[in-house]
């Protein structure tokens, strides 16, 4: 009852609905229209009465009453006087909450520049006035006068005059001949007198005339700002303020502390400062004070307003009493603690609690154990309501008492309330969406939350003291979503790769693995069982053991559902697992008739999920978990020190390697190899030795041994744990029982002396010391990288947040070509893995039989993948989010399968956020895991090619010679060895490095795993193709070549040094020339002379006058020594790729096909030209720093996209030269390589979604008849819209090239300014948006979260869609009514709209 009465007097104002938010510069009139009165005094509250002072910063007359419906002097109290203004104190009688919304203002005695438009770079004021920021500051801060109207004097407009110069000018010309002003008034006058249309016209004509790039850019920037002002309706002089708004007092509160002191918001101090200076200035002007004093006061006023808006942006930071900088208005918005990120994007919520988690193995997958005390607190309101409804209590107070006393009926009611009411569990850090899942609560005693063991992987939780938070979804809709979308039973697959994530781990795996072992000569071997009853009986009586080889009948059903059975050779343990498998013709007994390692269990769950559906999978998982736990317990697997086996051959292997290392030392001492080569070889030798010891150890541990009775001995426990995937890796076993191997220094270099001992033997002091390096680096890395990884995720989410599935099909004919990824002869990602769940772009036919496998536009499913791989198809064109042509978001067909559901993706799925989480989540995982190996190093270098298929060799661009040893050597730069199968279909194609030894020739057959090429990974050779005598050119000792003698060996080597560093060497071009027997320079086969240019650091392998034959090495350039690769290099690498940074020494890529020619050299650059192969193409020239290792020779043929200079290519170059598809495959492969090294599987489509967001902008190359300027960066969508309207009017459309933006830049350039401002550089984004008068249409997720609406994804997306259709429908009906034809004709259109939401737009 009371509630209804209250509602009478306190009507809820209906919430404003709006579709967009616009931001612009406030004019003084606007500020006054917001204001409820001017603030004249700096006082806040009266220190005796604690009432606000009149006209002060908390004035009740301006801002409203302090208590609800009560004026300040107390004359009018209560509701009945609502709306009356008290004649004594002038306060309106109303709600006190108006103090949160009413604003005031301060009339400034002198105008003041707004610091954002002055100092936020690029400065808007200085760009508009076309003056430097320094000059404007001089005028604003009263250092110089500026001439605004020169009259007939010799002064120029906008000329700065110092005090003395001004005085002199006044003396010379007289005071009224010219006008010079100072301070913000001057800038105000100049801005107010600007004619924007005229300026824009002048700028455009000037741009057409100018030729210099720099000037063009400068004019363009200015033109852009001028046009922004014209379009937005802002006036330039509004950037100078004459009125300062004062925010409502309850947003800058003054709180009494105990002890009579007050805590105040910093803003009050800043406002007080402004008011004080303003009042003083007013008085000084009234008193006609001397100019210098007034100027000083004006300057101080300007500074205090600056501090109010953005403290510390200019000059000294204003500090409070305790030397702490005061928080200005800008600081309220900026950064992690600012309004956006602290209060709008991440709020704390009510109805939540947190506690420690413990394991709950007896729970079902959809349940969690909730402590009773916690549940009682969380569900209090529900309990009160139910107590009231059941008549246990009549008032809330009584209900409260009952609950506090914990009466028995309360517990019964709690049970009722909780039943079927899901709660959300969340474990921080929430790295992906599986970090929050819904469960049904089960009440438990104690104070710990019980968590189902199978969901630990998803939460990345363990039970060593982790805590989790519980949240209660309140509304019916929230409960529904929690149940339907977030329930743990609905999240069986991992959104990043589509593999099951509800997988047994640790104990469970060990138990299942133990259960599925098959041993020889066990009791009961060879028995046969017809059903499970017999089997259990035999096991009970110990007639047979779990691991015996038996024959058993497995009962299942066929496709029609009739029972069938078949006899398998298996073990009782496997039969027990088979008993749990759902009966389905597609889930054969073979899925569990094998050793159940973690991988196989995952595959088994995957099979069950794909064929039996979700419900069966959940039941199956629960039963598998129970089985795993019970058998892990019964097996009693444990290990002691004797389980770590040290191989007997270790001593010999170490001895051999030590001898080898001695030999390398000797070679180095004899000068046959350099220091660097020796280092590489030693490291290599020890690396191989470590591997060998590890292999021997594994062989020993794996070995099957029999006891005296001929029964197989039990398996080694450590091996069981590692092999099953329960705990421990071969690497850790190697350190326990093999040898620890090589260690890395913190810099990433490898220490030459390895650790020969293992942990069982114990380390020597030196070894221990060496190993501390790596271990400490691991710990330091972890701390640093966690932060970096989180930041990467944040940037990814920000760039991709508005990528949502908006349509079913965009109908594009573009796509990407997918092929298998082969690395070092191993297939790392088969074509099947890459195309599964994607949509085929073209029809896929079997190349031999010609039968159709997949129709174009259909999704490629598991059976299709098998067929495609069987048919030996090498490349498949698929649709991709990257090439999707929908304007906003992506379409379902281009995206393909929703990995977390295994079905085509739903409308409204937020695929951008999922992609960002999938890429960011492993980043953190990996960085947290670097140190487990204790910094054990691995050398990663490939030096050979192996055939990955059988078939016939075909060599593309064949260019080989036999050298003096009779071995074939590759002399071509773009030679590729292809392997064809018997049908002549290409199975693999691999490029061969220059100088490789080739062991096959055209037409040879190879078998799988056969080596067909190898090379030295540490040096790059320079070889001759003609025979003759060696001569040196410009090889001058001490200038271009240094002969260094190694002290320890007395051997000299000649190495090319940087010859440009000495004055005498600037014009040298060191080269080796081959002359024929007549003493003339030999001719090469392809034309040109046999002159080989040397690059810095090359080591000469020949002497002058030496005879050489084809294929001999003249010189070799060392490559840097192998550094170890781990994700530490990996995470920054991923960030570098997503930020699209140019690598430090980036590769130079050929822009056209053609022949290499050397031109005239510059001082320290070498000029390389490409003569185009086709006519009508301009030759391209490149300048290459002379010292760079440059391996092309005059006359080499090079293809478009080949590297002229090695290194990492810049992604922008790939985009410009080879196009979007090449860029996509480069970025996807490079990023995937980093993750693959760590064994993380991420689906390509996630990376493609992010790359799509990086390619949203276009740079205008031809403006056509549009208003764009060449060089403008515009949104792709915007350009398409403009072009459509231009073409409709019969005008010339504009053209542009796609631009690649890094993720930070792309996030800041989103169409939504709210989203950009909440990401980074808040002040800059808001300044820019205000000048341009931008409108935010609230299309992404972030903007909607910030303004507090449902996000336009998932269920929210559907609501938005319905709302949109409804408005369209209303408009249509109104339109029809207007025409006067009645509403009938609109109905068929509406029906069509309801069926196809896309049409409604």
From Swiss-Prot:
It comes from the Bacteria. It holds the Pfam family RNA_pol_Rpb1_1. GO terms for biological process: DNA-templated transcription. Zn(2+) 1 binds at residues 71, 73, 86, 89. Mg(2+) binds at residues 462, 464, 466. GO terms for cellular component: DNA-directed RNA polymerase complex. It catalyses: RNA(n) + a ribonucleoside 5'-triphosphate = RNA(n+1) + diphosphate. GO terms for molecular function: DNA binding; DNA-directed RNA polymerase activity; magnesium ion binding; zinc ion binding. Keywords: DNA-directed RNA polymerase, Magnesium, Metal-binding, Nucleotidyltransferase, Transcription, Transferase, Zinc. The RNAP catalytic core consists of 2 alpha, 1 beta, 1 beta' and 1 omega subunit. When a sigma factor is associated with the core the holoenzyme is formed, which can initiate transcription. Belongs to the RNA polymerase beta' chain family. This is DNA-directed RNA polymerase subunit beta'.
């Amino acid at each position: 009852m009371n509630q209804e009465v209250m509602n009478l007097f306190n009507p809820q104002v209906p919430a404003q609905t709006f579709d967009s938010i616009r931001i612009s510069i406030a004019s003084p009139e606007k500020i006054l229209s917001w204001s409820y009165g001017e603030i004249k005094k700096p006082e806040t509250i009266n220190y005796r009465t604690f009432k606000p002072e009149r006209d002060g910063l908390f004035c009740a007359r301006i801002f409203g009453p302090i208590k609800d419906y009560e004026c300040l002097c107390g004359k009018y109290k209560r509701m009945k006087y609502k709306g009356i203004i008290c004649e004594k104190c002038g306060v309106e009688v109303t709600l006190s909450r108006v103090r949160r919304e009413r604003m005031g203002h301060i009339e400034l005695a002198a105008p003041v520049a707004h610091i954002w438009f002055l100092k936020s770079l690029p400065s808007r004021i200085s760009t508009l006035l076309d003056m430097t920021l320094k000059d404007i500051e001089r005028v604003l801060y009263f250092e110089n006068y500026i001439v605004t109207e020169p009259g007939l004097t010799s002064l120029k407009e906008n000329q700065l005059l110092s005090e003395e110069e001004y005085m002199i000018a006044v003396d010379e010309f007289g005071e009224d001949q010219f006008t010079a002003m100072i301070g913000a008034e001057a800038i105000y006058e100049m801005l107010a007198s600007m004619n924007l249309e005229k300026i824009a016209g002048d700028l455009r004509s000037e741009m057409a005339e100018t030729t210099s790039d720099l000037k063009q850019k400068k004019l363009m920037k200015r033109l852009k700002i001028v046009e922004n002002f014209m379009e937005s309706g802002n006036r330039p002089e509004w950037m100078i303020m004459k009125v300062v708004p004062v925010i409502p007092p309850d947003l800058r509160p003054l709180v009494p502390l105990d002890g009579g002191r007050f805590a105040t918001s910093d803003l009050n101090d800043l406002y007080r400062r402004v008011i004080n200076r303003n009042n003083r200035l007013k008085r000084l002007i009234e008193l006609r004070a001397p100019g210098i004093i007034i100027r000083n006061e004006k300057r101080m006023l300007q500074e205090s307003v600056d501090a109010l808006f953005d403290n510390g942006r200019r000059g000294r930071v204003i500090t409070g009493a305790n030397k702490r900088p005061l928080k200005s208005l800008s600081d309220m918005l900026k950064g992690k603690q600012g309004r956006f990120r602290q209060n709008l994007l991440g709020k704390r919520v009510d109805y939540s609690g947190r506690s420690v988690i413990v394991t709950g193995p007896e729970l079902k997958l959809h349940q969690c154990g909730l402590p009773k005390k916690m549940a009682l607190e969380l569900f209090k309101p529900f309990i009160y309501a139910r107590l009231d409804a059941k008549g246990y209590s009549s008032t809330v107070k009584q209900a409260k008492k009952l609950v506090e006393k914990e009466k028995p009926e309360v517990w019964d009611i709690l049970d009722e309330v909780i039943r079927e009411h899901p709660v959300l569990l969340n474990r921080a850090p929430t790295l992906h969406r599986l970090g929050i899942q819904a469960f049904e609560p089960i009440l438990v005693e104690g104070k710990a939350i019980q968590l189902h063991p199978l969901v630990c992987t998803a939460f990345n939780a363990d039970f060593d003291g982790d805590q989790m938070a519980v949240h209660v979804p309140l509304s019916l809709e929230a409960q529904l979503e929690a149940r339907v979308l977030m329930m743990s039973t609905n999240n069986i697959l991992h959104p990043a790769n589509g593999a099951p994530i509800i997988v047994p781990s640790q104990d469970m795996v060990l138990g299942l693995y133990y259960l599925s072992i098959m041993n020889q000569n066990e009791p009961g071997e060879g028995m046969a069982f017809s059903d499970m009853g017999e089997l259990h009986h035999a096991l009970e009586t110990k007639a047979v053991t779990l691991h015996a080889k038996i024959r058993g009948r497995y009962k299942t059903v066929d496709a029609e559902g009739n029972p069938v059975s078949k006899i398998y050779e298996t073990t009782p343990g496997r039969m027990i697992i088979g008993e749990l498998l759902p009966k389905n013709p597609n889930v054969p007994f073979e899925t569990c008739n094998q050793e159940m390692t973690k991988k196989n269990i995952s595959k088994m769950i995957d099979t069950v999920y794909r064929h039996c559906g979700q419900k069966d999978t959940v039941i199956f998982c629960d039963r598998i978990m129970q089985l795993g736990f019970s058998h892990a317990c019964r097996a009693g697997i444990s290990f002691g020190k004797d389980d770590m086996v040290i191989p007997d051959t270790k001593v010999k292997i170490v001895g051999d390697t030590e001898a080898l290392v001695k030999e390398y030392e000797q070679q180095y001492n004899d000068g046959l190899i350099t220091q660097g080569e020796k280092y590489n070889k030693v490291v290599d030798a020890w690396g191989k030795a470590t591997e060998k010891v590890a292999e021997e150890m594994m062989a020993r541990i794996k070995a099957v041994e029999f006891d005296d009775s001929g029964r197989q001995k039990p398996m080694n426990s450590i091996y069981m744990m590692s092999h099953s995937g329960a705990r421990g890796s071969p690497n850790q076993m190697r350190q326990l029982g093999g040898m620890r191997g090589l260690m890395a220094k913190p810099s990433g270099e490898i220490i030459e002396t390895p650790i020969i001992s293992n942990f069982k033997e114990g380390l020597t002091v030196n070894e221990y010391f060496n190993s501390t390096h790596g271990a400490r680096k691991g710990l330091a890395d972890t701390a640093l990288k966690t932060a970096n990884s989180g930041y990467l995720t944040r940037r990814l989410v920000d760039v991709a947040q508005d990528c949502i599935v908006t349509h079913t099909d965009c109908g594009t004919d573009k796509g990407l070509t997918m092929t298998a990824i082969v690395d070092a002869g191993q297939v790392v990602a088969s074509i099947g893995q890459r195309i599964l769940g994607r949509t085929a772009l073209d029809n896929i036919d079997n190349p031999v039989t010609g039968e159709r496998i997949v129709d174009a536009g259909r999704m490629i499913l598991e059976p299709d993948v098998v067929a495609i791989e069987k048919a030996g198809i090498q490349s498949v064109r698929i649709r991709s989010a990257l090439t999707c042509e929908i304007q906003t978001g992506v379409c379902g067909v281009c995206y393909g399968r929703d990995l977390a559901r295994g079905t085509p993706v739903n409308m409204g799925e937020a695929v951008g956020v999922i992609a960002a989480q999938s890429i960011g989540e492993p980043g953190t995982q990996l960085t947290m895991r670097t140190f487990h190996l204790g910094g054990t190093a691995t050398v990663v270098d490939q030096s050979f090619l192996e055939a990955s298929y059988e078939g016939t060799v075909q060599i593309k661009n064949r260019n080989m010679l036999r050298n003096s040893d009779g071995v074939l050597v590759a002399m071509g730069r773009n030679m590729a060895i292809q392997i064809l199968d018997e049908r002549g279909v290409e199975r693999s194609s691999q490029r061969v490095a220059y100088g490789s030894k080739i062991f096959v020739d055209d037409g040879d057959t190879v078998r799988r795993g056969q080596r067909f090429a190898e090379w030295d990974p540490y040096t790059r050779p320079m070889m001759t193709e003609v025979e003759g005598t060696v001569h040196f050119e410009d090889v001058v000792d001490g200038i271009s070549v240094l002969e260094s003698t190694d002290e320890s060996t007395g051997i000299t080597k000649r190495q090319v040094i940087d010859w440009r560093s000495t004055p005498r060497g600037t014009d040298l071009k060191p080269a080796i020339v081959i002359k024929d027997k007549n003493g003339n320079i030999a001719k090469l086969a392809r034309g040109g002379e046999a002159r080989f240019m040397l690059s810095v650091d090359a080591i000469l392998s020949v002497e002058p006058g030496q005879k050489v034959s084809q294929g001999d090495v003249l010189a070799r350039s060392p490559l840097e020594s192998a550094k170890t690769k781990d994700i530490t290099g990996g995470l920054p690498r991923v960030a570098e790729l997503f930020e699209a940074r140019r690598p430090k020494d980036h590769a130079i890529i050929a822009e056209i096909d053609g022949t290499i020619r050397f031109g005239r050299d510059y001082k320290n650059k070498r000029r390389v030209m490409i003569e185009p192969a086709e006519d009508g193409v301009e030759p391209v020239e490149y300048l290459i720093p002379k010292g760079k290792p440059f391996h092309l020779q005059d006359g080499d043929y090079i293809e478009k996209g080949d590297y002229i200079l090695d290194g990492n290519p810049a992604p922008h170059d790939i985009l410009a030269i080879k196009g979007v598809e090449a860029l996509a495959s480069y970025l996807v492969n490079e990023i995937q390589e980093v993750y693959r090294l760590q064994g993380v599987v991420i689906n390509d489509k996630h990376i493609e979604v992010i790359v799509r967001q990086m390619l949203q902008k276009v740079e205008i190359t031809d403006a056509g008849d549009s208003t764009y300027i060449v060089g403008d960066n515009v949104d792709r969508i915007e350009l398409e819209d403009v072009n459509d309207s231009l073409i409709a009017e019969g005008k010339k459309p504009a053209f542009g090239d796609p631009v690649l933006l890094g993720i930070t830049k792309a996030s800041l350039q989103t169409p939504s300014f709210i989203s950009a401002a909440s990401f980074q550089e808040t002040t800059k984004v808001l300044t820019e948006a205000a000048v341009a008068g931008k409108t935010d249409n609230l299309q992404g997720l972030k903007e909607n979260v910030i303004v507090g609406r449902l996000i336009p994804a998932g269920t929210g997306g559907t609501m938005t869609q319905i709302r949109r259709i409804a408005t369209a429908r209303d408009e249509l009906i109104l339109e029809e009514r207007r025409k006067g034809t009645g509403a009938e004709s609109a109905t068929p259109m509406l029906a069509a709209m309801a069926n196809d939401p896309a049409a409604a737009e």
